[in-house]
Amino acid sequence: VDEAAPPAALKALALRLLETGLTISWWGNIRFEEAFSPDLARLLAASGCIALTAGLEAASDRLLERMKKGITVDQTARVAAAFHQAGILVHAYLMYGCPGETIADTVDSLERVRQLFANHLLQSAFWHKFTATAHSPIGLNPAAEGLTILGPTFEGFAENDLRHADPNATCPPWLGEGLRAALLNYMEQAGFDIPSQRWFSHRVKPPRVTKTWLTQALAASSDVPLTAERRCVWIGGRPVIAATGRTRTRVILPTRTEDFTISLASPHTEWLLRFLHESTPSLSRRNHAYPRLAEVRDRFPAAGARGFDRFSRGSAWQSMRQAGLLLV
């Protein structure tokens, strides 16, 4: 059983909450999947999501691959950044003492976690010692990792922790003590200037992770492509016609924190108002699909898809996106 909520399910939940106008605060448990785009993060936040928890585990690509987690550390950083930008708090489950993990791996992981906290991409975390579970890849095939399962017999979900022996383990008690001390400081936004290896009572080598790891990981992120099948959802306020001229109309797009003003040709204004109305969550939308981007392109006045492509590269479209037009 995987209790992590999939992106599609949370998207559906967020839309239903917005459609019904139900105002609640909620949080959930997820996997750091790249399907959690910046736009999806904004949708979740608009529906009342205030926090999410997820497993970063060993914070090492090599160990995440061995555990078959299906995520990378760079990917985790980008997803956490999307939630941070949307105002959603992130709690990470961390793990040390994994099969095959060296002390150098653990020090590297601490440096990555330090950078995530220092840049406010994590707000809280808990670092626990590895435990095999009954239906994890390691629990199902412990011999592949050199482990011996000592018991107990599996008794159902939430009763699935297994005791194990690992003759190759490199996990002395002082390692966990150092991790806990560092994490306590990081959660208080303190201790970032202390070198990672200084948290441990025994001598360890400096981390192999560069100080610019996070900057590089986030720089590798690209904007969500204008995929034709994405649905358009408007979470901004109702547009206001500010002024109408002979050929152009000034439209205000209100949000909770600021207003965005755009100037459009008159035919484009009519298209915009209809488009945003069709994209706004409401009770009347519950039985109707939100417009796909492909449909929006085809209905663009005058030049159709080609004209829309030019329009989407302009400042008006960018203001619409900032004001609450999501592609999810």
Regions found by a protein language model. Give the residues of each.
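Flexible glycine/acidic-rich beta-alpha junction loops that bind and position SAM and/or redox cofactors
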Residues: 8, 62, 66-67, 96-104, ...
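A glycine-rich phosphate-binding loop feature that marks nucleotide/adenosyl-phosphate handling sites
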Residues: 2-7, 31, 126-134, 200-204
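Acidic/polar loop patches that form or flank catalytic/metal-binding clefts of enzymes
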Residues: 25, 91, 120-127, 195
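A structural motif corresponding to the C-terminal end of an alpha-helix
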Residues: 47, 79-90, 116-121, 181-193
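Conserved SAM/AdoMet-binding glycine-rich loop
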Residues: 1-89, 98
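Catalytic cores of alpha/beta
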Residues: 39-41, 100-115
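Radical SAM enzyme core and accessory elements
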Residues: 163-328
